[in-house]
């Protein structure tokens, strides 16, 4: 992707076990509105190489390095679920690099049920089914009504991606303190 420095840049950060696919329509819309859009896959996710990053802080540092690589000086970060934790951490640690923050369906702390972590670490598809049930129950607005099979495709991905992400969320303890340090405009979007 070529970045046009005169345009503002939006970074779209997916949630646990997911990839840039979840932002496809948003990416098209924001691009058509004149924004640079970085719809990323975290390491180990989607089309990205390397192992999954094991902590929210590691992901924040990776985002900073990505910005340096693509020569972007400031971003508006839109984070979903785990991406909210990354957004909170990033905005508190790198205030000069963030213009705006949008948090979608997340919180400053995300304790994860140990049974769910255990299922993911075992590569059990039930971990995915439970997440989709809790997060999207009743929704048919996804790929063929079934987001699970199109986003995460194997038990290896459940073990090596989803389990790592769930542990990163569960182990992030600096959320409240980080939230208090944020000084950029922030929009929180939550449902019931």
Residue ranges and their predicted role:
Residues 13-15, 80, 190-191:
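The conserved beta1-alpha1 loop
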Residues 41, 76, 99-102, 180:
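Residue in the alpha/beta-hydrolase core beta-strand immediately N-terminal to the catalytic nucleophile
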Residues 85-129:
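Flexible "cap/lid" loop of the alpha/beta hydrolase fold
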Residues 58-75:
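Conserved acidic catalytic loop of the alpha/beta-hydrolase fold
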Residues 2-49:
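Conserved HGGG/HGGXW glycine-rich cap/lid loop of the alpha/beta-hydrolase fold
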Residues 182, 188-190:
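Short beta-strand/loop motif that positions the catalytic acidic residue
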Residues 118-183:
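Conserved alpha/beta-hydrolase catalytic His-Asp/Glu region
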Residues 42-45, 106, 169:
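Active-site loop/turn elements of alpha/beta-hydrolase fold enzymes
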């Amino acid at each position: 992707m070529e970045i046009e420095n005169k345009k503002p840049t939006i970074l779209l950060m997916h949630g646990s076990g997911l990839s840039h696919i979840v932002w496809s329509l948003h990416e098209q819309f924001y691009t058509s509105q004149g924004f640079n859009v970085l719809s990323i896959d975290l390491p180990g996710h989607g089309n990205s190489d390397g192992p999954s990053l094991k902590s929210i802080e590691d992901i924040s540092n990776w985002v900073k390095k990505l910005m340096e690589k693509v020569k972007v000086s400031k971003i508006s970060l839109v984070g979903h679920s785990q991406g909210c934790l990354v957004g909170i951490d990033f905005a508190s640690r790198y205030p000069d690099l963030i213009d705006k923050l949008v948090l979608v369906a997340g919180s400053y702390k995300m304790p994860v049920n140990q049974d769910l972590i255990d299922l993911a670490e075992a590569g059990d598809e039930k971990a995915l089914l439970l997440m989709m049930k809790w997060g999207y129950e009743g929704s048919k607005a996804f790929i063929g009504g079934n987001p699970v099979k199109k986003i995460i495709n194997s038990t290896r991905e459940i073990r090596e991606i989803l389990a790592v992400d769930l542990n990163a969320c569960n182990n992030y303890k600096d959320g409240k303190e980080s939230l208090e340090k944020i000084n950029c405009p922030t929009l929180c979007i939550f449902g019931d």
